[in-house]
């Protein structure tokens, strides 16, 4: 069953391009990864949305995702509220519309 993960980020002022470039370098060849999009949700705010063939593939890729994050962690601001620099969520698709 298809799964998605999303991660919310806030980038430090003036470091947006560096943040985006770090993702371009990854071009993740991870098993089960089907598509990745980064959306800009506000000034310095971004969300990454990734589609996976199944939840097991997503779970197996978590160490790679963390290693990737470590490569650009210094470009991120703390989100506050005890979240740290990311706000990740993931899960299987339970309803597909168009």
Language-model features: locations:
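Glycine-rich beta-strand-turn "strand-cap" elements at beta-sheet edges
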Residues: 1, 8-10, 35-47, 71-98
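Conserved N-terminal glycine/acidic-rich loop preference
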Residues: 4-5, 19, 46-55
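Short, surface-exposed ligand-recognition loops at beta-strand->loop->(often short) alpha-helix junctions
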Residues: 8-21
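A short, structured loop/turn motif at beta-sheet edges
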Residues: 12-14, 56, 98
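Residues in flexible loops and secondary-structure boundaries
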Residues: 17-19, 27, 41-47, 60, ...
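An amphipathic, aromatic/His-enriched active-site/gating alpha helix that lines ligand/cofactor pockets
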Residues: 25-35, 51-87
């Amino acid at each position: 069953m298809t799964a998605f993960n999303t991660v919310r980020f806030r980038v430090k002022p003036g470091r947006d391009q560096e943040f985006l470039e770090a993702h371009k370098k990854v071009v993740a060849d991870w098993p089960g990864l089907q598509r990745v999009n980064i959306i800009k949700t506000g000034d310095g705010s971004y969300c990454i949305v990734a589609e996976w063939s199944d939840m097991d593939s997503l779970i197996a890729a978590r160490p790679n995702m963390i290693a990737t994050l470590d490569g650009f962690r210094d470009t991120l601001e703390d989100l506050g509220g005890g979240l740290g620099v990311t706000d990740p969520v993931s899960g299987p698709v339970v309803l597909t519309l168009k």
